[in-house]
């Protein structure tokens, strides 16, 4: 909703019209931040391999409230985060990184995708363990 409000304000729509428009679209179920957050999180995780932190940043940028973001990301426990990081790692590196520079590149990729350092390290170690 915050994103729509910002767009209408930039278009210089008066405040009363903005409030009424937001009320109507909310009543009709066209805008639902909870649903939006869940769908974005699921899509970005499945399609792009994003971690929880990158999803959090995107939702904050879209103006989703903190409590909605927190509730959405509660589903991402350490185990599911590690599994998602491992899946991304396997797509990019079918064979585990063999040298320290390769491990650093893999680590950098995972962190840029929004995975915490601990999750990235765990995924790299697991990738090396499973293939070895």
Regions found by a protein language model. Give the residues of each.
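An alpha-helical, amphipathic repeat domain used for nucleic-acid recognition
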Residues: 1-132
């Amino acid at each position: 909703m915050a994103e729509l409000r910002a767009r209408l304000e930039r278009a210089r729509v008066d405040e009363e019209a903005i409030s009424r428009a937001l009320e109507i679209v909310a009543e009709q179920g066209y805008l639902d931040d909870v649903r939006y957050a869940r769908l974005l999180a699921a899509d970005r995780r499945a399609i792009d391999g994003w971690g929880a932190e990158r999803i959090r940043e995107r939702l904050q940028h879209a103006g989703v409230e903190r409590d909605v973001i927190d509730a959405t990301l509660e589903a991402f426990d350490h185990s599911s985060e590690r599994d998602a990081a491992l899946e991304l790692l396997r797509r990019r590196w079918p064979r585990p990184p063999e040298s320290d520079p390769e491990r650093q590149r893999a680590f950098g990729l995972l962190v840029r995708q929004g995975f915490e350092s601990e999750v990235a390290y765990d995924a790299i170690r697991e990738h090396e363990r499973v293939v070895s």
